[in-house]
Amino acid sequence: MSLNRPVQPHDLLWGMPVAALPADAPAWVSDVVGLGHPVVVRRAKVAEGWVAVGVRGRSRDQRFAAVMKLSDVTRCIKPEQLVDAVDHVEADWPALCALKHIRPVLDAMHLPWGVAGSAGFELATSIKVLHQDSDLDLILRAEQCFSRHRAAALVEALEGAACRIDLQLQTPLGAVALREWAGSARHVLLKADDGARLVSNPWQLQERAA
């Protein structure tokens, strides 16, 4: 397929061929890929024409890092495309109940946001991976500086949800946890393609490696 936009971390990609897996890949990885399940884009430096991906299995400890040719991608779903999907499923797990509850709060940010992690995977595939204790993983794209005061207000607005919410602010330089940015620490951990580093401003690259 022709990708109209660059792939980004947390995008779900279809089309990974089993033959592209390394020889040391566990059997469950080959099984999952063979079933046509999507892989998720992760942060890592790769050669041009390739993308770093992760394969997820049934359990939390089943995660496998791999790389995929962009030319093999047959379908791409971004976290933002999954927000409306919650309207068409039974919200029988806390993570989905929380998503429905906090949706107006995030819509009020007037910034692109989406669903990642287990909730995003289940909404995109209808494969049952959520459980009673699943967190709700979200992303919020903030191309411009998202103030610490605004971050703290958002953390407060998300309190009381049916499950723990892990929201990552996606900046042009990487990702930072909303709760960490809303805190009082001078430096926060910025996760980028070339590694993690402690920064005082996730929108300005200037700092030291973690």
Language-model features, listed with the residues they occupy:
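Helical scaffold of the NTase/Pol beta-like nucleotidyltransferase catalytic core
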Residues: 1-118, 151, 155-163, 167
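Non-catalytic surface loops within mature trypsin-like serine protease
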Residues: 57, 142-144, 171
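Mature, function-bearing regions of proteins
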Residues: 71, 75-76, 187-202
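Active-site nucleotide-donor binding segment shared across nucleotidyl transfer reactions
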Residues: 103-136, 140-146
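Generic structural "secondary-structure junction" signal
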Residues: 121-125, 132, 180, 190-192, ...
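Short, charged/polar "capping" segments at the starts of alpha-helices
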Residues: 147-149, 176
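Conserved catalytic core of two-metal-ion nucleotidyltransferases
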Residues: 159-195
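Expand to "…catalyze enediolate/carbanion chemistry for C-C bond making/breaking, isomerization
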Residues: 210
